Structure formats: structure tokens, C-alpha cells
Amino acid sequence: MYFTAQQLDEFKAARDGLSGRYRTLMEKYIMLPLSSPEATEYARHGFARRLASLHHAVDRLFEVLPPDLEGIPNKAQLADASAFIQNALVHVYGCLDNLAWLWVKEPGIKKANRRGPTLQAI
């Protein structure tokens, strides 16, 4: 086994909590009151969609290569894991890009000096 029993318990707890945290974050962005239609598009159909794909990729990665896997994974498992990791990284980048565009398109969002209106912490 590659991980200790304590580490496996930590992985399980983190994975078990992932769906709830994902749903909470997605709901916050879908319900975010934005005045710009473009910002709303980036929040709901960009960020939220990519977040769903990211959640799916991470979930599938844990199914293909569970932390408690005994022995060496076969080539198919490694290929699937590689694809899911690459997919996750693409969607992390896409999420960041969508958030950047949301902040550019939504009027009234100011710099870090917090002068003027800003989005509430999500």
C-alpha cells in the first residue's frame, strides 16, 4: 500500500466532502446577482460548467486510481488517469479565465484597494 491508513481516511473524508463543496460553490456563482449579461454568461455558463467538468474529472480519477489501490496500475488505468488529470488542469485554467472575464465585464468591480463597490466574498 502506498498510503498509511490515516492518509487514506483523510483522502476519503476530502472526497466525501467534495460534492457538497462543489454544489455550494456552483450555487453561489449561478445565483450571483450580476448586472452585466456578459458577466452572467461567464459565471453561469463558463465557470459553473467548467466547475462541473472539473468535479467529474476529479471524481473519475479517484474511481480509476483509488488511493488504496494495491499493486501497479495497468496501462488503461494510467491512460485514463492521465486524461482525467489533463482534463482537470484544462478546466482549472478555464475556471480562472472565466472568473477573470467576469470581473472585467461586471461594472463597478474595483482594484484591490477596495475603493468603490466590489463583489462580496464568495
For the regions a language model picked out, list residue spans one by one.
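Charged alpha-helical initiation segments
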Residues: 1-85
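Short non-catalytic regulatory patches outside canonical folded cores
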Residues: 43-44, 73-122
